[in-house]
């Protein structure tokens, strides 16, 4: 675990199809060549495609994490993170897009705070809608 707080980078646009996800993946790849521990947080909660883009199988996702925090079942953040390689990890969007509506935005800061001392960089992929989830990420 690191002592310094991670740099948070949020990629956003108010229009869909502008390359947000591609940009996040390219930045993550670049950061990995610099040996910076990076986590991608897929906050395109209704239609996140980071996991399939990386061709990884996700066991637990963002919904599982926030649900467990809300219901006092949370143990450690690592249980919800999917490893891609030595330098890139993923906190995936919900596998079931219906779960996006069940995520309370107040837990986003809790999650980002827990991640901030574990990684050098937090990359956040968002959707194109300005909502409570995205407004919180803009403040980080």
Residue ranges and their predicted role:
Residues 5-46:
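Walker A/P-loop phosphate-binding motif and the immediately C-terminal alpha-helix
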Residues 6-9, 22-25, 48, 63, ...:
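Alpha-helical membrane and juxtamembrane elements of multi-pass inner-membrane transport
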Residues 20, 49, 118-119:
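Short N-terminal binding/cap micro-motifs at the start of the first secondary-structure element
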Residues 31-90:
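Phosphate-binding loop that captures ATP/GTP phosphates
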Residues 71-135:
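Cytosolic-facing regulatory segments adjacent to core modules
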